[in-house]
């Protein structure tokens, strides 16, 4: 039995200058999902986002990349959730996670923002913490004062390869989540190990 996911959200900052920065890992994941399923995203002025739709069998999934900056991501999510009457527990948000190393991604249900401004704004705008999360590891600079520069910087070639490979697996795990459910998707993604290349 699959898990209902009605809204897939990728977090990032809009604009070419941010495209390859670590903070845009959520965008990368949604782009990968859309590429695999031949989904086209189009601008929507009301929700200030790029939006798309994927229908297969019983699944009817809306996809959103907010085009406000990260700390205003909640506007787009709340606007679309309200319009399509999607409850928080049927929303899946993909975003970059400092507390996981590159090459690791984890599903999570509910909880606080963990210092992530995009998640913080979604909680504030939707009034709920109950949405599912897909946390994509980007690593940590080791010093709290360096976090802003780190997330807005580009990963090294090796880190980027680890992140990209992991995103491919995480994107496929969303298919597993909808087809086979939370437990199977968790098992698949959480047992993934990146290939280390010398």
UniProtKB/Swiss-Prot annotation:
Function per UniProt: Hydrolyzes ribosome-free peptidyl-tRNAs (with 1 or more amino acids incorporated), which drop off the ribosome during protein synthesis, or as a result of ribosome stalling.
Catalysed reactions, semicolon-separated:
an N-acyl-L-alpha-aminoacyl-tRNA + H2O = an N-acyl-L-amino acid + a tRNA + H(+)
Task: Name the family.
Answer: Belongs to the PTH family.
* Site description Stabilizes the basic form of H active site to accept a proton, residues in chain: 96
Q: Quote the EC number.
A: 3.1.1.29
User: Which keywords are on file for this protein?
Assistant: Cytoplasm, Hydrolase, RNA-binding, tRNA-binding
Q: What highest taxon heads this organism's lineage?
A: Bacteria
What InterPro entries does the record tag this protein with?
Answer: Pept_tRNA_hydro, Pept_tRNA_hydro_CS, Pept_tRNA_hydro_sf
- Which terms does the UniProt entry file under GO BP? protein quality control for misfolded or incompletely synthesized proteins; rescue of stalled ribosome
- Descriptive protein name: Peptidyl-tRNA hydrolase
Q: Where in the cell is it found?
A: Cytoplasm
Pfam families for this protein = Pept_tRNA_hydro (PF01195)
| Record-marked site positions (Discriminates between blocked and unblocked aminoacyl-tRNA) | 13
Q: How does it assemble?
A: Monomer.
Residues of the active site = 23
Q: Which residues form the signal peptide?
A: none
UniProt binding sites for tRNA: 18, 69, 71, 117
Show the GO MF annotations: peptidyl-tRNA hydrolase activity; tRNA binding
Q: Which GO terms describe its cellular component?
A: cytoplasm
């Amino acid at each position: 039995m699959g898990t209902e996911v009605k809204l897939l959200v990728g977090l990032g900052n809009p604009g070419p200058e941010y495209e390859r920065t670590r903070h845009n890992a959520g965008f990368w994941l949604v782009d990968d999902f859309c590429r695999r399923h031949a989904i086209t995203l189009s601008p929507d002025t009301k929700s200030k986002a790029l939006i798309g739709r994927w229908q297969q069998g019983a699944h009817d999934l809306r996809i959103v990349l907010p085009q406000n900056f990260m700390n205003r991501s909640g506007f787009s999510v709340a606007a679309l959730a309200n319009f399509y009457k999607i409850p928080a527990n049927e929303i899946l948000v993909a975003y970059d996670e400092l507390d996981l190393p590159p090459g690791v991604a984890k599903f999570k249900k509910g909880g606080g923002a963990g210092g992530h401004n995009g998640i913080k704004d979604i909680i504030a705008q939707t009034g709920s913490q109950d949405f599912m999360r897909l946390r994509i590891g980007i690593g940590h600079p080791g010093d709290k004062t360096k976090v802003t520069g780190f997330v807005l910087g580009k990963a090294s070639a090796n880190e980027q390869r680890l992140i990209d490979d992991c995103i491919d697996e995480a994107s496929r795990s969303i298919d597993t989540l909808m087809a086979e459910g939370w437990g199977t998707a968790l098992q698949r993604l959480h047992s993934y190990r990146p290939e280390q290349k010398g």
